[in-house]
Amino acid sequence: MENGFLLINKEQGKTSFETLFPIKKYFNTNRVGHAGTLDKFASGILVCLVGKYTKLSGYFTSLDKEYVAEFRFGLETDTLDPNGRIVSKTDYIPNVEDIDLKLKDFVGEIYQSPPRFSSVHIDGSRAYKLALNGKFFEIKKRKVTVYNIQRLSYDFSSSLLSLKISCSKGTYIRSIARDLAYSLNSCAYVSNLKRTKVGMFRLKDSTLCENLSKASLISLESLKSFEKVYIDSNKINLVKNGVYFEIEININEFKILKSREEKILAVIQGVGLNKYKYVIIF
């Protein structure tokens, strides 16, 4: 079975889950997943995991993201995207000076409420399922980090604002559109969204599903943030059997265990000071 990860350029109109179908078919395995869901209306880089690499989903999901987003002022939909039902309208369209001033409030550590149509869990149910059934519920605000917002363009006549946003995991761009508009006494939704970066990986390095090849599969060697630890031959069987021995590691740090012959043996993750768990054993 193949093991590795892929940088897929997800197309608009497909869910992240649907994007996995051709990957499963190509590699002839159901052991395929993705890290960091992209909404159906969105496009851009989606990290997909094959084989044992599916166990690294948590790592890839935790990486920072970059998006290019388009907000349309004057309308709000229930989903805060183009596919939703219009729930609010206004004739007031903010000017660019006010937008630039308010954007500063959305940089740094901020608290935001995820959209009602999202995969957030509410008492054991997904928020979007409750919303579809017309249920009343509240979503608690969450702390996220927005590292930078750059205005790319603003067309007052069409009410379209284009932004580049760098942010931490868990940041909802749809919530930024909603909250920015509210702060300007207007309303808005995200009319277009493209993810351009996940961690160190860029959209330009991704591939469309129809262009898949075995060469598209990326190994752990490309993860420069994973330190390599070389294991002596007398300890290789210990690694293969998941036996613990002394390795210096910090909490949440990932390390690759390799033989002196450069063969990857395992991936470990720190769960405390010099304490770790095996994530993958090859």
UniProtKB/Swiss-Prot annotation:
The active site is at residue 39. The keyword Isomerase applies. InterPro entries: PsdUridine_synth_cat_dom_sf, PsdUridine_synth_N, tRNA_psdUridine_synth_TruB. It comes from the Bacteria. Pfam families: TruB_N (PF01509). Its EC number is 5.4.99.25. Keywords: Isomerase, tRNA processing. It catalyses: uridine(55) in tRNA = pseudouridine(55) in tRNA. The keyword Isomerase applies. GO terms for biological process: mRNA pseudouridine synthesis; tRNA pseudouridine synthesis. It is an enzyme of class 5 (isomerase). GO terms for molecular function: RNA binding; tRNA pseudouridine(55) synthase activity. Responsible for synthesis of pseudouridine from uracil-55 in the psi GC loop of transfer RNAs. Belongs to the pseudouridine synthase TruB family. Type 1 subfamily. This is tRNA pseudouridine synthase B. It comes from Borreliella burgdorferi (strain ATCC 35210 / DSM 4680 / CIP 102532 / B31). The gene is truB.
